[in-house]
Amino acid sequence: MADDNGGGGDDYVSEAVRPEGDTHTREEGLSKSRDRDREKDKDKERHRDRDRDRGRDRDRGRDRDLDKDRDRDKDRDRHQRHHRDKREHRDRPDDHDRHRSRDSERRRDRERDGHRRHRSRSRSRSRGRDDHRSRSHSKSKRVSGFDLGPTAQSVLPQFPTIPTPSQLPGSSIPGMFPNMLPFADGQINPLVMQPQAMTQQATRHARRVYVGGLPPSANEQSVAIYFNQVMAAIGGNTAGPGDAVLNVYINHDKKFAFVEMRSVEEASNAMALDGILFEGAPVKVRRPTDYNPSLAAALGPSQPSSNLNLAAVGLTPGSAGGLEGPDRIFVGGLPYYFTEAQVRELLESFGPLRGFDLVKDRETGNSKGYAFCVYQDLNVTDIACAALNGIKMGDKTLTVRRANQGSAQPRPEQENILLQAQQQVQLQKLVYQVGALPTKVVCLTQVVTADELKDDEEYEDIMEDMRLEAGKYGNLVKVVIPRPHPSGEPVSGVGKVFLEYADVDGSTKAKTAMHGRKFGGNPVVAVFYPENKFADEDYDAAA
């Protein structure tokens, strides 16, 4: 028993007396162990955080995939609805779509036609060529601009027409019955014109005046103010106090206006203002084309008042009236190539003119083959009509008569004057028959314009047309079509076409066949041209 206790005591003593350094080492080891445990715990926590982040990322990815799937489903549904609508639209006969399609087709046709007219006048000649015509087309398939001959209406002189009462503006007014105008043609029942509105409408053609040659700065207000002032200055306001002008319409492109007066008498007084200066430019004052003297005679005075003070506005008394009145002469059947100066010279063989107007096409500026004139000495009116009527001028026959009534016979005391005038006309006729004697050269006018010749492609088309058509009638030696100079310098003969043949037989056939044919909407004028002038390249000789 003593051994057991003794042994146990030794152990206790040995533990109690263990060195202090061993204790410190053990505590340090325990501390490190705890630190390692803490680091492990932190690592585990970090792993859990990363796992949670990865989980959230996976959830967001799944959400994005779901959104994409939903978008794809929506796109697929829209695509299917679109195709279903298109199929239904095709299958359903919708009237609106048909109308819209027809409108589109008509619009495309108009655009095609406008493009053709702009690019090539050959389309207006009904030549049947495509817009981009190939040069390789055979001649047998090519349609010439000369295929159609002139209509009878196009070669006859245009005479003024007198409308019937049914054609009067007032006759178509609502509330008016046909039996309200039981009078003969050219007469008006004044009882029908009682209401002011109907009177205004029925007299409008006699209350309007044409004013041409306006400056570019002119407008409706300035024209109205000016004519109100000058009408008051000359004493032309015969309808009472106030402005004479009711309305003004201006065509700025062509520089003319229609001025509507408040009364027929004031419109006639305004005719005395022909040649007056408006903003420094002399203007023409004329009756409009719908004016008819026979109908206007029942509505009021057709001549300006003799009491007008024209000197107040710088006009010479005695020039009033211009081309109006019963002594106005119609001159028809003039050769198209006659210039204004040539026609004037012919008419003035009977005396000085008070008024003269060679009627021209507004678009081309070419003569329409007729004119109007009034002589200062009205006594020579019948003499001139009798002397000039029926005279041959080239291949034309003149028709000369009073414009507003049938031809009157000259009085006995005028017979000697008439005989002398006829002899003078016969001499002048020889002067104006240039182109009557056959030559090898034919000159065509009213075929082309300067603008058309500026375009190279159009020029070649016209040249080819001329060669093909002119070659049908004989041995064609040369075709000359003068063109405008790019610098703007004057070039002789622009607007004419010259055809030179090997002999007179060919040129005669060509002149006969081509004269009066339609080319570009105009009747072609074909005359012989002096060979010496053609050889000298003088293309401005009268032809």
From Swiss-Prot:
Q: Which CDD domains match?
A: RRM1_U2AF65, RRM2_U2AF65, RRM3_U2AF65
Q: Where is the composition biased (Gly residues)?
A: 1-10
Composition skew (Basic residues), residue ranges = 115-126
Alphabetized InterPro entries for the sequence: Nucleotide-bd_a/b_plait_sf (IPR012677), RBD_domain_sf (IPR035979), RRM_dom (IPR000504), U2AF_lg (IPR006529)
In what ranges is there compositional bias, type Basic and acidic residues? 17-78, 88-114
Question: From the UniProt record, which GO molecular function terms apply?
Answer: poly-pyrimidine tract binding; pre-mRNA 3'-splice site binding
Q: Which residues form the RRM domain?
A: 207-290, 327-405, 446-532
Q: Which GO BP terms sit in this record?
A: spliceosomal complex assembly
Main localisation: nucleus
For this protein, the record's Pfam families field holds: RRM_1
Region annotation (Disordered) ranges: 1-171
| Notes concerning its domains | N-terminal RS domain has a very strong bias in favor of D over S.
Give the protein family.
Belongs to the splicing factor SR family.
**What is the name listed in the Swiss-Prot or TrEMBL entry for this protein?**
Splicing factor U2af large subunit B
